[in-house]
Amino acid sequence: MRLSQMLFVTLRDDPSDAEIPSHKLLLRAGYIRRIGSGIYAYLPLMWRVLQKVSQIVREEMNATGAQECLLPQLQPSELWKESGRWDTYTKAEGIMFSLIDRREQQLGLGPTHEEVITAIARDMIRSYRQLPLHLYQLQTKFRDEIRPRFGLMRGREFIMKDGYSFHVDEDSLKKTYQDMYQAYSNMLRRAGLAFRPVEADSGAIGGSGSTEFMVLAEAGEDEVLYTDDGKYAANVEKAVSLPADAEPSQFTTFEKRETPGTETIEKVTQFLKASPTQIVKNVLYQTAYDNGVTVLVLVIIRGDQEVNEVKLQNELTKLAANYGAKAIISLTVPSAENQQTWTAKPLPLGYIAPNIADEYIAANKQIHPKFVRFVDKTVVDLKNFITGANEAGCHVVGANWGEQFPLPEIVVDVRKARPGDRAVHDSTQLLKSARGIEVGHIFQLGTKYSQALGATYTNEQGEEKPLVMGCYGVGVSRLAQSAVEQSYDKDGIIWPVAIAPYHAIVTIPNINDAQQVEIAEKLYTELNQSGVETLLDDRNERAGVKFKDADLIGIPYRIVTGRAITNGKVEIVERATRQSQEIPIDEVITTLQQWIRAAIEQKN
């Protein structure tokens, strides 16, 4: 392709609304154009990158025996109501775009396709002889992000590969899950990315287990906790660890103490000259379920620890059926205004005890009349601890479970693991932190969707059983931008060879020099014919402008038909290393073929 004929416009300055380097560079280099909040056009160079990423994804998926298909983007609400996810995805902070058609039918623009694929399986799979089965698609997805940001990293419209597998049992699912683990590792390795698979929370997708594939980058939205021995890595939302040991309490007798102005852990520790590990703090939440019921939640946790709200939401989801609900709409720390809607009398905020009376909750048919009390494992073995006295300005010291306070029945792990904690698998290993960009996520769904939608098969004994499912997603457009976030310098993008829009760019420093033009044209034609995808910069611009643009757009090899041609050579500059060599003109094709092959094979 000739740059003189391409839609090619670069910017010298960073766009004001771009926050991270990859977003700035893709805009500056003319790869993408912002059309609206979280909505981008993929321009010719970007489309070539996306096609290459998609091809790698296809090849790895096809190698596992998965079959490509294409599912509808418009999805009837009835399917989502069958699964119980319609309200979760369309109300409050839900991410589904929903609409009503001219026949007054509710529809959603697909953020994911579990419901659709399960409905297809329900209609078409009858026997164990048809299993296992794995279908996938590459398609545009839509998500109504609360805060679209970072370009293609968190957009409202994006390209994704999503796959769904169906099995007779968990053993069959686990085999496909492992196949996908390997396929995803292959995809990212072939694309030239440094990544780390990590244990992850399954979120709204659900299921018994999942793995995220994180591209390591400082601008990543996710925090990954890992150990140096390589035996543990997890998203902080999922991570577990051993907290520091609690310090012995200096209080041996139970008594109430006046502690005015000590509403925070820091203040009460200073006032009582105690360690936060001796404190039982009681954190109040309110959760709204999809049937309109609000439940008040008390999380009882050690004073030096933080609540992991993802873990907490998972525990509350397990209780949904107790309240006649299927899913959680929201989980918040109630503001003073919110508290007024359900409190019968003012709460002693900052001084709440584990046994705060249910009478604080006003009678209201939409409000559950009792607190749900979760006790975190960090406080179960505490002795002679400090906690609130249910009275403003007062705490109790020297308290014990089974004496002054009953130990709540629901014991959970809802603490947030953090760097420096000891690892569960080896207490000599300390957790370390890294930032990552989630580009892939694989799930063991089990029978969550098949049971909800009645998708069954007949086994060898003639019994009807629910299909066992897995699902597997890769953000194609996010992966492409992640490559930029991981590989750039002050002058521009440095594309991995395997996904670069072109392998090489032939730059003519002076288009008025007939010899430069002739050699450039010949190389351009022959390189493309030999399989080296090549751009020709034949624009009527100064050489310096062309060199800067070549660096900015990140083509792996720049061929310059400059002064070296008088010696029968051209200059080749490798973008990644800046190394420059003069190569005889008749050796350019074989040299580049070797370099490109070596760069790609190194990642395979």
Curated annotation (Swiss-Prot):
Pfam family, one: tRNA-synt_2b
UniProt-listed Gene3D superfamilies: Anticodon-binding domain (3.40.50.800), Bira Bifunctional Protein, Domain 2 (3.30.930.10), YbaK/aminoacyl-tRNA synthetase-associated domain (3.90.960.10)
Keywords for the protein's UniProt record, in alphabetical order: Aminoacyl-tRNA synthetase, ATP-binding, Cytoplasm, Ligase, Nucleotide-binding, Protein biosynthesis
Listed EC numbers: 6.1.1.15
Compartment annotation: Cytoplasm
Example GO BP: prolyl-tRNA aminoacylation
GO cellular component, one term: cytosol
CDD domains attached to this UniProt entry: ProRS-INS, ProRS_anticodon_short, ProRS_core_prok
Molecular function terms, GO-annotated: aminoacyl-tRNA deacylase activity; ATP binding; proline-tRNA ligase activity
Known catalytic reactions: tRNA(Pro) + L-proline + ATP = L-prolyl-tRNA(Pro) + AMP + diphosphate
SUPFAM superfamilies documented for this protein: Class II aaRS ABD-related, Class II aaRS and biotin synthetases, YbaK/ProRS associated domain
Record HAMAP family: Pro_tRNA_synth_type1 (MF_01569)
Role noted for this protein: Catalyzes the attachment of proline to tRNA(Pro) in a two-step reaction: proline is first activated by ATP to form Pro-AMP and then transferred to the acceptor end of tRNA(Pro). As ProRS can inadvertently accommodate and process non-cognate amino acids such as alanine and cysteine, to avoid such errors it has two additional distinct editing activities against alanine. One activity is designated as 'pretransfer' editing and involves the tRNA(Pro)-independent hydrolysis of activated Ala-AMP.
Homology family: Belongs to the class-II aminoacyl-tRNA synthetase family. ProS type 1 subfamily.
Subunit structure comment from the entry: Homodimer.
Domain statement: Consists of three domains: the N-terminal catalytic domain, the editing domain and the C-terminal anticodon-binding domain.
PANTHER family: MITOCHONDRIAL RIBOSOME PROTEIN L39/PROLYL-TRNA LIGASE FAMILY MEMBER (PTHR42753), PROLINE--TRNA LIGASE (PTHR42753:SF2)
Protein name in the entry: Proline--tRNA ligase
The organism of origin for this protein: Nostoc sp. (strain PCC 7120 / SAG 25.82 / UTEX 2576)
Source organism phylogeny: Bacteria, Bacillati, Cyanobacteriota, Cyanophyceae, Nostocales
Gene that encodes it: proS
